[in-house]
Structures are given as structure tokens and as C-alpha cells.
Amino acid sequence: MTEVEPKSVLYCGVCSFPPEFCEFGGSFKRCKEWLEQNDKELYEKLYSEDALANATSTLSIDKEQKIAKELEKKQAKEEAKQERELKKQLASKVTIKRIERNKRKHVIAISGLEVFDIDMKKLSKTFASKFATGASVTKNAEKKDEIIVQGDVSDEARAYIEKLLEEKGLNEVKVEQIDDKKKKKAAEAAEAAAAATGNKK
């Protein structure tokens, strides 16, 4: 029996649709730019002057102009929406907080990812697998999702998140690493108090 090789399907790095369907999404302009950079051959096949001429050859001039105008209006509206969302994303930041649980044991809390359309549960599973540790999604004090990862892997997590954002064209987003000093001092104070109580006995 002849083995049938699975067909390789390219998905857009911006909207995640196959490139043939990008025009129906809200980020068509960015999708076209992504395709031109990543698959020049398919870009020419879909968007060269010949391809566009063939696609509209059966339409009347009036109908063609009407469709073009409606599509342009829709795309302008969607692009304005995308522009607002992009500005919001670029103004946001991701925080990786390193928290000391007890001596030599740490966890990191990653927050601020919810505005970037990133699947938090999927990312926590990726971290658990990649760093061979525990990871879960919880709600922080602001009632927003954050990823808690066991172990001091803040540098590795930062590198991975920066790469993830870069793939989405969000290179300018700041990924900030901080130490939770309050928790650390509180833990030290608790240990000191426990030691003092023990000495009195």
C-alpha cells in the first residue's frame, strides 16, 4: 500500500488563517506583509497584478468597483481597529516577578500577557514541559490571569516570551523582570520570629 504524505498547510503568522483566507480577517494589510516576507512565491500567486486581474476578470466594471470600494471601506475600518489594539499592546508590558518561597526555592509569576491574544493555559503547559517543572494559570490580586512557574527560570521565560512577541510583530513590548522584595523580607522576618520564639523556649 502506497503511503500518502500529509499535505503541508501554511498558516498566517498574524491571523493564523491559511493565507488564502486572510482577506476576510481584520488584519489583511499586516497579513500581506507577513506573507511577502515568509513565502514570496505564494504572495505572488495571490497578490500579483496578474492574479488580481484573473480574480476580477468575470466581473462587470461597476460591480468590480463596488466590491473594491466595500472591501476597502471594511478593511479601513478593521485596520483602524487593529491599529488601536496594536497601540494598546505596544503600551502594555509583561511582568515576570521572581518570588522567594523559602531558602533556595523560588517561583515566578508572569502577568500582562492577556492583552496579546496568547493562550495562557497552553503557554503554561509549554513552560511546564520546556522547563521540566510545575506551571499553572491563576488569578492575581487584580483578578487577572497570571502564570505561576515553579523554580527560578525567569531568564529562560523572558527569552521565550520575547521570541513569542517577536513572532507577533510586537518587538517593542517591554518584558520586565522584578524581584518581589516584600515577600522575601516577610519570609525572612517570619523565620527570624520563629527562631526567636524557639530560643525563648
UniProtKB/Swiss-Prot annotation:
Pfam families per the UniProt record, alphabetical: DENR_N, SUI1
Location (main, coarse): cytoplasm
Any one Gene Ontology molecular-function term assigned to this protein's record: mRNA binding
Domain SUI1 positions: 94-165
Gene3D superfamilies listed in its UniProt record: SUI1-like domain
Location relative to the cell: Cytoplasm
Gene Ontology annotations of biological process type: formation of translation preinitiation complex; translation reinitiation
Gene Ontology CC annotation, any one: ribonucleoprotein complex
PROSITE patterns in the record: SUI1
Keywords on record: Cytoplasm, Ribonucleoprotein, Ribosomal protein
Keyword DNA repair assigned: no
Family: Belongs to the DENR family.
Subunit structure and binding partners: Interacts with the 40S ribosomal subunit.
Domain characteristics, as noted in the entry: The SUI1 domain may be involved in RNA binding.
UniProt-recorded name of the protein: Translation machinery-associated protein 22
Native source species: Meyerozyma guilliermondii (strain ATCC 6260 / CBS 566 / DSM 6381 / JCM 1539 / NBRC 10279 / NRRL Y-324)
Gene: TMA22
